[in-house]
């Protein structure tokens, strides 16, 4: 891995995430979108807990509240985006979801120049709003917006948990919380699907690796060898990679307006990331980059 360029590792992490999403969608007919999200969360949470074995005996009330809040955001983000995938193309859903962290960055900006990126992102939203997906699958768009809100909440809570809890213990506990949150909604369909087709355990085990374990490892390796500014810009390619994964695996094409919207949101994300890094380098306050 040391010979692989860091940008390649970062791109591989994003490709892995979107491939996992596309593979999961191929089995929605067997377990439903919520059942699929539940299986992914259960397998991912159990594997992470076994690897990390979080030490929670001496946690304070504030640490517990932070981990639970992070878990709620994580669970909502996973369930809502999978429900969105069921009715709209992955590329469109991820573009809408990206508006969560992008809006969070823009809300905290203190520079007028970032209004340009806000307008560009708004243009993307408007184009998505008048595109064919929004007209024919309003429910999917709504769930993607909910996922965007959860992603923004996840970022806020992740900063708090990262500062309050050392290592990845907080993440391991939050994954367990996300799993518990999903169980009342997806357990029955997940169990019914696995009983009919036990191979689904292997499929969603692979999804958990592609969507969680492998990207996390690749991102850690990449961040050790590249500036976070460059990493943030590469992360902004997420919607485009999602669209390509949807096209390659699910044969999901995007309408011209949706492609333009994707480009607008991606460009706004790149702009916010670069602007924030320049501001930090000059000692001024700035926005936070769009996270992975």
Please describe what each predicted stretch is:
Residues 11-19, 23, 51, 68-83, ...:
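Hydrophobic alpha-helical transmembrane segments of multi-pass membrane transport proteins
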